[in-house]
C-alpha cells in the first residue's frame, strides 16, 4: 500500500523525500476526503503542534486517524507529531488543544528552548545504533506508561519512544541523511 503523511503544516515534504528514497509510495493528508486514499501507515511530521492539532480537528481527520492508530496502524511521529500522540502534556503546556492522545506518555513542549536552542547531536537508538539527531524547539518525554519502551535519551531526557505500532521522536530524522529511522518505521 502506501504511507500517508500529514501535510497540513510542517516538515512533511522532507519525510516524503526520505520515504521515496526507500521506495515507499506516499499520499498526502490535507483534508478529510484524503482519508479515502489507500494507506497502511502514517507520518506525523514536525512543525507546530497547536496548529496541526487544531487543523486535524477542524478538517475532520482527528477521530478517524485516532481510530486507525488505536487499531494498530504504524505511525512515525517526529517533534510536533510526538506532542500530537501524547496522552498527556506538562501542566503549563496543556491548553486543551486537540491531540490524538494514543501514546501513554507525558510530554513537555519546547523543552529544549526556542529556535536558538536548536542543536544537532548523535544518539544511541535501540534497534538502529548511533543515529544523527537534529533538535528544533524540541519536546522531550517526562514520563512513560508501562507499555512504552524508551529507545533513546539525550542529556538524561527521553527523546525517542515506542508503544507497539507507535514510534515517537523528539527530533527530526527527515533532516539528516541517515535512512535507518525511516527503515525502522517501515519495519513496524
Role assignments for model-derived ranges:
Residues 49-123:
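Cysteine-nucleophile active-site neighborhood
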Residues 26-27, 75, 166:
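Hydrophobic anchor at the start of a short beta-strand
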Residues 43-44, 77, 169:
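Redox-cofactor binding/interface segments in oxidoreductases and associated redox assembly factors
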Amino acid at each position: 500500500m502506501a504511507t500517508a503523511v500529514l501535510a497540513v503544516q510542517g516538515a512533511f515534504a522532507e519525510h516524503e523525500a526520505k520515504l521515496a528514497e526507500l521506495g515507499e509510495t506516499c499520499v498526502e493528508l490535507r483534508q478529510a476526503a484524503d482519508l479515502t486514499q489507500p494507506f497502511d501507515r502514517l507520518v506525523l511530521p514536525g512543525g507546530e503542534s497547536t496548529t496541526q492539532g487544531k487543523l486535524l480537528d477542524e478538517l475532520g481527520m482527528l477521530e478517524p486517524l485516532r481510530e486507525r492508530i488505536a487499531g494498530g496502524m504504524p505511525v512515525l511521529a517526529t517533534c510536533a507529531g510526538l506532542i500530537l500522540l501524547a496522552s498527556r502534556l506538562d501542566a503549563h503546556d496543556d491548553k486543551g488543544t486537540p491531540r490524538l492522545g494514543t501514546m501513554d506518555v507525558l510530554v513537555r513542549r519546547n523543552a529544549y528552548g526556542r529556535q536558538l536552542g536548536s542543536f544537532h547531536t548523535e544518539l544511541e537508538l535501540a534497534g538502529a545504533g548511533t543515529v544523527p539527531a537534529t533538535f528544533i524547539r524540541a519536546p522531550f518525554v517526562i514520563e512513560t506508561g508501562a507499555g512504552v519502551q524508551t529507545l533513546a535519551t539525550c542529556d538524561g531526557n527521553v527523546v525517542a519512544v515506542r508503544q507497539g505500532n507507535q514510534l515517537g521522536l523528539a527530533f527530526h530524522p527527515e533532516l539528516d541523511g541517515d535512512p535507518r529511522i525511516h527503515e525502522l518505521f517501515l519495519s513496524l
